[in-house]
Structure formats: structure tokens, C-alpha cells
Amino acid sequence: MFEEPFRWMEAISTRHSYVREKLKKGQPVIGVPYNEGAVIIGFSPQPGKIYEIYDRIALGGLGHPADVERLRMTLLDMAHAEGFNRSAKDVTIGRLLQFGLAPALKQNFEEIQRAPYLIQMLLAEINHEDTAEFFRVNYDGYWE
């Protein structure tokens, strides 16, 4: 009974190692700000690494295509619900991450019976001052 927290911590550490090893093989996504917005470039020969989420929000994904698509659809649904319930100006990456995506990713990662998302995302937002903001989201819900 006393070793259960240790087992959980060991399982989390193993999951971190597993996901990092899988993501090493992926093709990167790079975001660059410029005067009139931002550019997101994907280096994968496969289509479908860069998406528009909402009017001024874009997503670049690295990882398993099914996980990228599932989280893209989640972000898309959240953004449209937020825009419908409040206003289009209230749809920001900060709100989408803090109240929707990050808690879901964290919960999924910490449930050791489930497979973790194999994903790392770059989100770009052109704010109302026309400057670009970038956020990196990890598989465990951590974002910066």
C-alpha cells in the first residue's frame, strides 16, 4: 500500500520517456512572427500538419496524425462554442488552453491505464494589436 505513489510516479516517468522517444522521429513545425502576422511552416511531406482553428488562431501539430486530428477538432469545437456563447473577440488561445485543452491533456496523461496523446502543438494567435503570440503545448497539458 505504501508503494502505490511510487508506482504511479514511475509510470508517469515511463510515459514521459515513451512519448519523447516517439516525438523525436517527427518532423518539426516552426512559427515565425513578422510585421503583418505570423508564418507557420511544417517540414513533413504528408499533408495536414497546419490548420486554422478560428479567425486569428492557427495550429501546427507534431505527433500521431489521429491525435493531432482529435485535438484539432476539440479546439475547433471549443473555439466555435466560445465565439457563439460570448463573442468572437473572447476566443483566445489563452482561454482555450487554460479552460479546455490543457486540463484534458493533463488528465489523459495522468490516467496511466489510457494511452497518452503523442502530440506536441504550436498555436499561433494574431491578437487585436496585430502582433503574433505563440504557445507550445505538450502532451502532458503543460503549455507556455
Where are these regions (language model features)?
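Long, low-complexity N-terminal extensions
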Residues: 1-144
